[in-house]
């Protein structure tokens, strides 16, 4: 079992190499249909399984097409990783779509909407009625 430091170093190396492959060596047109970037790599402690999280910018159709292209290129990516990274065993590669950027944008837009509603809402009266008034007795 590899140490935590080694796992994180190998994960960063895989992230860098897969990013380079996406830019230069994967020739599948489906992969180029959406703007794509590798956001993270989750590597198992025994260095046998790598989940590669990718963020795809584009329409839903482009995302689906890009994910299909990545899934078909999984064998090629694993083979290239074996040539570029010298490990005893090359990890199994699984591509996962990372939608955290979109979810973050949705949360920010909701927060801006709430802030805008609060600014446009008239301020409620925070003054308490005098002690001897009729409203205070109710």
UniProtKB/Swiss-Prot annotation:
InterPro entries noted in UniProt: KH_dom-like_a/b, RbfA, RbfA_dom_sf, Ribosome-bd_factorA_CS
Cell location: Cytoplasm
UniProt region (Disordered), positions on chain: 117-138
Main localisation: cytoplasm
GO molecular-function terms, A-Z: ribosomal small subunit binding
GO biological process, one term: maturation of SSU-rRNA
GO cellular component assignments: cytosol
Alphabetized Gene3D superfamilies for the sequence: 3.30.300.20
Keywords: Cytoplasm, Ribosome biogenesis
Top-level taxonomic group: Bacteria
Function: One of several proteins that assist in the late maturation steps of the functional core of the 30S ribosomal subunit. Associates with free 30S ribosomal subunits (but not with 30S subunits that are part of 70S ribosomes or polysomes). Required for efficient processing of 16S rRNA. May interact with the 5'-terminal helix region of 16S rRNA.
Subunit structure: Monomer. Binds 30S ribosomal subunits, but not 50S ribosomal subunits or 70S ribosomes.
PANTHER family attached to this UniProt entry: RIBOSOME-BINDING FACTOR A, CHLOROPLASTIC-RELATED
Alphabetized HAMAP family for the sequence: RbfA
Record's protein name: Ribosome-binding factor A
Gene this chain is encoded by: rbfA
